[in-house]
Curated annotation (Swiss-Prot):
Family designation: Belongs to the RNA polymerase subunit omega family.
UniProt keyword Transcription present: yes
Annotated InterPro entries: DNA-dir_RNA_pol_omega (IPR003716), Pol_omega/Rpo6/RPB6 (IPR006110), RPB6/omega-like_sf (IPR036161)
Stored Pfam families: RNA_pol_Rpb6
Function, as annotated: Promotes RNA polymerase assembly. Latches the N- and C-terminal regions of the beta' subunit thereby facilitating its interaction with the beta and alpha subunits.
This protein's record includes keyword Transcription: yes
Matching SMART domains: RNA_pol_Rpb6
The protein's assembly and partners: The RNAP catalytic core consists of 2 alpha, 1 beta, 1 beta' and 1 omega subunit. When a sigma factor is associated with the core the holoenzyme is formed, which can initiate transcription.
Superkingdom assignment: Bacteria
EC main group: transferase
Entry protein name: DNA-directed RNA polymerase subunit omega
Enzyme nomenclature, EC number: 2.7.7.6
Organism: Pseudomonas fluorescens (strain Pf0-1)
Length: 87
């Protein structure tokens, strides 16, 4: 796809506001989250790649939410350990 238009993207999202939010989250994932693009990266910026993914119908809120789930250890796990108690 040579040029992405808003009309191409609006076929897959309900309105322009949702388009802005979805493309912003996806572009941030591509730029900083280490997520792999679903379309070929043709020397484009992350925002253009995100819009191309939306225009091709490959991106949705469900997909982004699924990728944002991170399984981490609890922040206070060290406090639960009895060996860390003050004497």
């Amino acid at each position: 796809m040579a040029r992405v238009t808003v009309e191409d993207c609006l076929e897959h999202v309900e309105n322009r506001f949702e388009l802005v939010m979805l493309s912003t989250k996806r572009a941030r994932q591509l730029a900083t989250g280490g997520k792999e693009p679903l379309v070929q990266w043709e020397n484009d910026k992350p925002t253009v790649v995100a819009l191309r993914e939306i225009a091709e119908g490959l991106m949705s809120y469900e997909f982004i939410a699924e990728q944002e789930i991170v399984h981490e250890d609890p922040v206070f796990a060290a406090f639960e350990d009895e060996s860390n108690e003050a004497v």
